[in-house]
Amino acid sequence: MTSTVAHGAGSAGPADDAEPMSARTYQVRTYGCQMNVHDSERMAGLLEAAGYRRAAEGTDADVVVFNTCAVRENADNKLYGNLSHLAPRKRTSPDMQIAVGGCLAQKDRDALLRKAPWVDVVFGTHNIGSLPALLDRARHNRVAQVEIAEALQQFPSSLPSARESAYAAWVSISVGCNNTCTFCIVPSLRGKEIDRSPADILAEVQSLVDTGVVEITLLGQNVNAYGVSFADPALPRNRGAFAELLRACGDIDGLERVRFTSPHPAEFTDDVIEAMAQTPNVCPALHMPLQSGSDRVLRAMRRSYRAERYLGIIERVRAAMPHAAITTDLIVGFPGETEQDFAATLDVVRQARFSAAFTFQYSKRPGTPAAELDGQLPKAVVQERYERLVELQEQISLEGNRAIVGQRVELLVATGEGRKDTLTARMSGRARDGRLVHFRAGDGPVRPGDIVTVEVTDAAPHHLIADGGILAHRRTRAGDAHADGQTVRGIGLGMPGIGRPVVPVAAEATSCGSAGGCGSADGAGSSAGDPQ
């Protein structure tokens, strides 16, 4: 669907009145899940290929692109609040352009312009590649452009990319989702699952490694389903395709770490566990959303598994990889949740001993079956349960981290992970299991992207401390690239990291696939992340 809407006085002027395209700068603001981060890198790549350049930090961009999330009312309010903040600048700088894409744009469509008529471009989740042309058309014609495709036009991974990191990269293996969780709006916004071919994925991974990337995260709404809906009709369905893909990644020289997100417990199979355990560069980390420990609530959520099956998967994972870090997503206050249901969730959390849990308070979202269910709970009840769950998980996380004190861990040095690093003279990195470690680098030239070995000296619920200095340091091509200025700012390494602080306020987003999409829960995360 394509439509145009005439702007008022705040619209962009004709091309002759505007500064040359080569001088125009851009900024992409991302809300939501890791799939949106992946897509934002593509938006940035498209703009740079079209002659735009990234705006310097602290400066006003000529083009501001919002890549949105549609999972909660909070996400809506945040977007429209930020758009309102730009309205005065739009009035005084008519050549400045605003574009809104992502899931909220796919959902609201023309309604977005009624709420924010100063927006220049609205585009959806299926036609990211149209962004430069839509901006150009809106700028030349002084008419807002709304283009929402109903089906995927091109895999985002095939588009140009301006990646945020020299050492870690997202690699999408599929788009869309075939599940029907009652709290999730993703299938209606991103469509049914479509899988990329293994050859395309492995070619992208190889090209990334050739540029110095040492860690990749495979992205999908439900990575376990990979292989059932290949875009290429010549490829047969293959239920074992994801395990085969993990093993194939293990054959790529120079690729040191492989992560993935997110699996669905209903389709988690033992061949994936075997591939994880037997492929050295696949990290001993698993983020597997639970959502609730109550079988009755899981049934109402249409999650297609029960607590016993979930705990059985964890048991088999730990049997194969005893030191694996397992994290999860939890929704508190789903419609009809009783105190008995909540107690069942607490019980499963105690048994599972998660390294971290990304916990969110439910809020109903129009367009999801759960929004129509009876038994919507009072906010006070949900908040009280949420606080109890976070307290329990904090205790479990701290106990798990304290058990690592005295151990040596290998870190991929990161940038932008520790807010207090400058004050404490520490740097930060991620262990192979995803834990965040703050360490003292000493006087050596340690760069983001390098590999260091340290000994853990202290622990907190969301991070580890290594103040004993560096025991080993390996310089990498990724570190060289970072030192050469080939990265702008850091991104998280793989799936929600173990080690972000408790923030008892509404989180950026929730999701039906922690990296792959967005669901319909609301609230704060005991470790900021997105639920599946």
Curated annotation (Swiss-Prot):
[4Fe-4S] cluster 1 binds at C33, C69, C103. Residues 1-21, 510-532 are annotated as: Disordered. It comes from Mycobacterium marinum (strain ATCC BAA-535 / M). One of its GO terms (cellular component) is cytosol. Its main location: cytoplasm. Residues 402-470 form the TRAM domain. Its EC number is 2.8.4.3. Monomer. This is tRNA-2-methylthio-N(6)-dimethylallyladenosine synthase 2. Its cofactor is [4Fe-4S] cluster. SMART domains: Elp3 (SM00729).
